[in-house]
UniProtKB/Swiss-Prot annotation:
The holoenzyme is a dodecamer composed of 6 PccA/alpha subunits and 6 PccB/beta subunits. Belongs to the AccD/PCCB family. This is Propionyl-CoA carboxylase beta chain. Residues 1-257 form the CoA carboxyltransferase N-terminal domain. This is one of the 2 subunits of the biotin-dependent propionyl-CoA carboxylase (PCC), the enzyme catalyzing the carboxylation of propionyl-CoA/propanoyl-CoA to D-methylmalonyl-CoA/(S)-methylmalonyl-CoA. Within the holoenzyme, the alpha subunit catalyzes the ATP-dependent carboxylation of the biotin carried by the biotin carboxyl carrier (BCC) domain, while the beta subunit then tranfers the carboxyl group from carboxylated biotin to propionyl-CoA. GO terms for molecular function: propionyl-CoA carboxylase activity. The gene is pccB. Residues 292-325 are annotated as: Acyl-CoA binding. The beta subunit contains the carboxyl transferase (CT) domain. It catalyses: propanoyl-CoA + hydrogencarbonate + ATP = (S)-methylmalonyl-CoA + ADP + phosphate + H(+). It comes from the Bacteria. Coiled coil: none annotated.
Length: 510
């Protein structure tokens, strides 16, 4: 028996060594952790239970029978994050470059199936050179099996992708279908075709970092939700994100201890909105002052900065936040901000996360680039996302709520439950100046008359009371009491239930 146990430990030690110490040292030399080190940092200490440690590939072409490392380049299993079960796979770049084989894919599919059966999130750590060319179509078939699991798990359990090395070719489509993608600066890359192919086909000279690095995907393409300085920071932030999320679509998000009085009054909010309606202010200040202990987890911070998305807690419960940012493009909606917010709203709705919308929006950004780029269809995505949402929704209008953008941003007309407005709110078709120039175009040559007409319009419409008179705003509240009012509103909506008409699926304007 002793010999058998020793043999088992020898096999385990060899499997844990991956591609060998030389390749582990090379991985560390690039500033990267190994697959197992990443899993250990991601999960609670000692909680990881590994599956299929000794699985090997079955390929015999190109002398592959002589290279059969245990585990086949991916570490899979389950563990806990703050005591809650998650399933994880971590590709091992030290083993055949982390390349994806048939059995490599089967290991990933196995834990994804288990995650769906048991209602737990899936976290994938990607660090792979791509398909294992020696296996040909078997490798591609493996990709397809993983893709199908991504699709079936979407909206059922949260899926999080961590890009911690190369992720190229067909491999990029699995992370692309997950809920969140995180990258590491200077060491992670995502692209369908690499720099060499780009140069051959288009004659463009571009580096891997420029083509598919963390900066590109967080600021330009919006493929990634955040980028971090190193592996350790990225893993810590994913642990933090998981703590905001439910395990699956049938559970509520976790309730965490809080020490911040939900009835806290914040007098500084009374002066947050400047007297001049054209002067910007930072909407994040309001978000931090509403949140328990001021804690805000922002999603896609570097992309479409004219809208803010992320998670806070109120009374220890997760709330998704969507807010216009007056500091950028005056808070206008455009193509990018509409796409960004729509995807976030749909995620929250899929996983029963209540939505708080903070509005200061003068309209949709005008211009040929927006119209040619399809702002109509992209703006409709956000409209559609809010209109189909059935989670508790609370809206606060802080200043401007003009035109179609007002309707799109979780208005009462889209079934928002509570719609509050500050006294500084202006709910109108458009700003006073633009409206006056249309209504009184015959007086445009008389500055005094135009000034008087503008003042009259402002007095009549540049306030929240017309909308309040019609029931489109539930109450005009004091800014200082916003946290209290919002917290009480969400507390009253915890048992909300909405019946939707039967449909096979919707047809959102993609």
């Amino acid at each position: 028996m002793k010999d058998i146990l020793e043999q088992l430990e020898d096999r385990r030690a060899a499997a844990r060594l991956g591609g060998g110490q030389k390749r582990i040292d090379a991985q560390h030399g690039r500033g990267k952790l190994t697959a197992r080190e990443r899993v250990d940092l991601l999960l609670d200490e000692g909680s990881f239970e590994e599956f299929d440690m000794f699985v090997t590939h079955r390929c015999t072409d190109f002398n592959m029978q002589d290279q059969k490392p245990a585990g086949d380049g991916v570490v899979t299993g389950w563990g806990t994050i703050n005591g809650r079960v998650v399933y994880v796979f971590s590709q091992d770049f030290t083993v055949l470059g982390g390349s994806v084989s048939e059995t490599h894919s089967k290991k990933i599919c196995k834990i994804m199936d288990m995650a769906m059966q048991n209602g737990a999130p899936v976290i994938g750590i990607n660090d792979s050179g791509g398909a294992r060319i020696q296996e040909g179509v078997d490798s591609l078939a493996g990709y397809g099996e993983v893709f199908q699991r991504n699709i079936m798990a979407s909206g059922v359990v949260p899926q999080i992708s961590m890009i911690m090395g190369p992720c190229a070719g067909g491999a990029v489509y699995s992370p692309a279908m997950t809920d969140f993608i995180f990258m590491v600066k200077d060491s992670s890359y995502m692209f369908v075709t690499g720099p060499d192919v780009v140069k051959t086909v288009t004659n463009e000279q571009v580096s891997a970092e420029e083509l598919g690095g963390a900066t590109t995907h967080t600021r330009k393409s919006s493929v990634a939700d955040a980028a971090f300085e190193n592996d350790v920071e990225a893993l810590a932030e994913v642990r933090r994100l998981v703590d905001f999320l439910p395990l699956n679509n049938r559970e509520k998000p976790p309730v965490r201890p809080f020490f911040d009085d939900p009835d806290r009054i914040e007098p500084s909010l009374d002066t947050l909105v400047p007297d001049n309606p054209n002067t910007p202010y930072d909407m994040k200040e309001l978000i931090h002052k509403l949140a328990d202990e001021g804690d805000f987890y922002e999603i896609q911070e570097e992309f479409a900065k004219n809208i803010i998305t992320g998670f806070i807690r109120l009374e220890g419960r997760t709330v998704g936040v969507v807010a216009n940012q007056p500091l950028v493009l005056a808070g206008c909606l455009d193509i990018d901000s509409s796409r960004k917010a729509a995807r976030f709203v749909r995620f929250c709705d899929a996983f029963e996360i209540p939505l708080l919308t903070l509005i200061d929006v003068p309209g949709f950004l005008p211009g040929t680039s927006q119209e040619y780029g399809g702002v109509i269809k992209h703006g409709a995505k956000l409209l559609y996302a809010y209109g189909e949402a059935t989670v508790p929704m609370v809206t606060v209008i802080t200043r401007k709520a003009y035109g179609g953008a007002y309707v799109v941003m979780s208005s009462k007309h889209l079934r928002a439950d509570f719609n509050y407005a500050w006294p500084t709110a202006e709910v109108a078709v458009m700003g006073a100046k633009g409206a006056t120039e249309i209504i009184h175009r015959g007086d445009l040559g008389d500055p005094e008359k135009i000034a008087q007409h503008t003042a009259d319009y402002e007095e009549r419409f540049a306030n929240p009371f017309v909308a309040s008179e019609r029931g489109f705003v539930d109450e005009v509240i004091q800014p200082r009491s916003t946290r209290k009012r919002v917290a009480r509103a969400f507390a009253s909506l915890r048992n909300k239930s909405v019946q939707m008409p039967w449909k096979k699926h919707d047809n959102i304007p993609l």
